[in-house]
Amino acid sequence: QPGAWGRMSGIFFTNGRQHLDLDTLQNHNAAETVSDLLYKGALKDHSRTVWQGMIKALPDAQRINGFQANRNLMLDRNARADSIPGLEIEADDVICTHASAIGRLDEEELFYLMSRGISREIAIEMSVQGFFDPLMRRIPFEGVRKRIFERIVEKIG
């Protein structure tokens, strides 16, 4: 439907030998539509994730705006994240962008927090919370945010 808008959010935290495959599709088949996708994950131990995202703009989907991003925080050297964003654009008047990032905890940031009397464990917890914060802000329900936060703390432990 012309003028439709969608926001997709995903949060994941893998550990052990978990393997998670995520496939997302933002299909623009009408004019003046907007899609906004943000998936964030943290990985521990020997876990692995694969995210494949696709924004499709059909020929009649003019003046659309599509965005997708996948960001991964590696908490162990043995964890692995593959991130494969994609665009299939058949229209000629669109704004479509994608982003992907895979990074590790910043040891200087952890050192700074520890120099202020914060234990390494709490410093890691704070850094992971900060990583997920932009996504958590997208969740309108306090109870859901609280439950997700509790699970994140459990997984970090």
Locate the predicted segments by residue:
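Conserved beta-strand/loop scaffold segments within soluble protein domains that form the structured core
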Residues: 1-111, 115-118, 132, 139-157
